[in-house]
From Swiss-Prot:
This is Iron-sulfur cluster assembly factor IBA57 homolog, mitochondrial. It comes from Pyricularia oryzae (strain 70-15 / ATCC MYA-4617 / FGSC 8958). The keyword Transit peptide applies. Belongs to the GcvT family. CAF17/IBA57 subfamily. The gene is CAF17. Gene3D superfamilies: Probable tRNA modification gtpase trme, domain 1 (3.30.1360.120).
């Protein structure tokens, strides 16, 4: 009787297990055909021009006589050189790991003594506490803005190389992380008060897909708090770090990596595919059988034909694309500085999401394969770094 009950529990546990992200959508559909539930369809491809409110971001006001001095000592960019316009940067911990990726904008209402810090909305309260804890005797005022006080927008138009939206009171900031991302725009009020742009509004998922296609990570679900390194997050290429400025928290490891270390891993855009041939180009597909929905964050990536150390780590995705932290000499054609080009072994140039256990793989499908791509802006930036050494 005890054995019968144990067998019944085993069957129930496996029968009710939620579908894994490693199985194709058609398999998931068959698995759930006896119920009304169905896998959520990925969003359609993003438009080539549009704007969207970034509800995933929030703003923190920092003002006072010591605001600039304080921020200069805790972020990776040089705020003295950027105090007239917005810029991209990061807060690090003492070990040189990323705490928060942020944009910082001058606050025109504070007479040159104020800034607005844009951060991952889920991390805004944490960053506010962090600043408050370490401001010591600095003369500054700190406040987390309510959602309805101001809104962060992203605007783009691929048909215009010199596109720069005119929005009245706000100053658009060109997104430095990729030439194709467009501009950041701040407006007072909530997202119902849209900026005056000759563009059509679009959901925030459009911006997310565009980020993934450009290989740009954002927020602490993609740039892992206290784990990610600035260079591995491509911050050394996107202008987030001033390597000539004075001391700041986390500077020692960052500078040492720049001058004496080798960055072996970087966040790259990736395509998921199944048994078909590896894709030749990075392309978003929302109507295929492969979907990143349900793939757990930080899932390991390994060689398809043999076991060994991890070659990467999946971070986030939508549809058939996503971001992963990839070992460059294994998953790409890039050659690391001072090292010979790695020769891929025959049959070992395919990579798969590696489940943590057998239970993570459905019986109807095999693990997804992963192909990493190096975006042009990153390839060019790394070439410029190599030439400058």
């Amino acid at each position: 009787m005890q054995a019968s009950r144990s067998a019944t529990r085993h069957l129930l546990r496996h029968a009710t297990r939620p579908p894994s992200g490693f199985v194709c959508r058609s398999c998931l559909s068959r698995r759930s055909s006896s119920t009304s539930a169905s896998p959520r369809s990925p969003p359609p491809p993003p438009p080539t021009a549009g704007f969207t409110a970034l509800k995933s971001r929030r703003l923190i006001s920092v003002s006072g006589p010591d605001a600039a001095k304080y921020l200069q000592g805790v972020v990776t960019a040089n705020i003295i050189n950027n105090n007239k316009t917005g810029f991209y940067t990061a807060f690090l911990n003492a070990q040189g790991r990323v705490l928060h990726d942020v944009f910082i904008y001058p606050d025109a209402s504070k007479d040159g003594e104020g800034f607005l810090i844009e951060v991952d909305a889920t991390e805004a309260e944490r960053l506010t506490r962090h600043i408050k804890r370490y401001k010591l005797r600095a003369k500054l005022n700190l406040r987390l803005l309510d959602d309805g006080e101001a809104t962060v927008w992203q605007a783009w138009d691929d048909s215009k190389a010199d596109f720069a939206p005119a929005v009245g009171m706000t100053t658009p900031v060109r997104d430095p992380r990729s030439p194709m991302l467009g501009y950041r725009v701040l407006t007072p009020g909530d997202h119902a008060q849209t900026p005056q742009l000759d563009l059509d509004p679009t959901p925030e998922t459009s911006y997310r897909i565009r980020r993934y296609l450009q290989g740009v990570a954002e927020g602490q679900t993609e740039i892992l708090r206290e784990h990610a390194l600035p260079a591995e997050s491509n911050m050394d290429v996107t202008g987030a770090i001033d390597f000539r400025k004075g001391c700041y928290v986390g500077q020692e490891l960052t500078i040492r990596t720049r001058h004496r270390g080798v960055v072996r891993k970087r966040i790259l855009p990736c395509v998921l595919y199944d048994h078909f041939a590896a894709p030749e180009r990075l392309e978003y597909k929302h109507d295929g059988v492969v979907t990143a929905e349900g793939v757990p964050p930080e899932t390991s990536i390994g060689r398809a034909t043999k076991r060994g150390r991890s070659t990467g780590k999946w971070l986030s995705g939508v549809g058939n694309i996503g971001l992963a932290l990839c070992r460059l000499e294994i998953m790409t054609d890039l050659t690391l500085p001072g090292e010979p080009a790695a020769a891929l072994e025959s049959g070992n140039d395919e990579f798969v999401l590696t489940p943590k256990s057998d239970e993570d793989v459905g019986s109807e499908g095999a693990p997804f394969k992963v192909k990493a791509f190096v975006p042009d802006w990153l390839r060019q930036g790394l070439a410029a770094q190599t030439a400058g050494h």
